[in-house]
Amino acid sequence: MSCTTIDFADYVSDGDSRLWPILGPNRGQRQAQPLAPLLVVLRDYILAHHALRFLPFNGSLRVLNLPPGYIATVYTNAKGRVVHTCHGHPRGGQWASFVSFIPHIIAILRGDVARCGCVLCLRHRGQGIPARKLPRPFWQIR
C-alpha cells in the first residue's frame, strides 16, 4: 500500500510569521505546541471529510508540517487553564483551537483561500457568525 504525503512547503500559503505572538521559554509563557498530535488530527480530518475530493489518495496519508507562516501555540492562562491557539492569519487574529484552524488549512490545500470558510476569513469578509444569545437563567424568567 502506498502513502500520500502532504508537505505544505509545496503549497502556496498566505501565512504571515510576523503576526506570531512572542514566545517565551518559561512555564506559563506562550510556547510553540508540539506538532505531532496536531498533524494526526489534521490527517484524520482530511481522511474523514476531504481525501477523495482533491488529493490523489492511495490508501494512507501522512502530513509533514503546517503551512508556512502558521504556528500552533500553547500557554497557561491566569486561571491555570491550558489554552491552545493558532496564529499567522494574514489579517491578524488567532484561531481559538486547532479544529477552528483546519478549514483554513483545507482552503490552502485546495488553492482557494479567497473562498475560505474559517472563522477569521468570514469575519474579515463581513460574514461573521453572530454570537449566540444565551437564554436567561431560570431564576430570572417571570
Which residue stretches match the model-derived regions?
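Double-stranded DNA-binding cores of transcription factors and transposases
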Residues: 84-88
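Alpha-helix N-cap recognition
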Residues: 96-101
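Extended, low-hydrophobicity segments enriched in charged/polar residues
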Residues: 1-83, 102-142
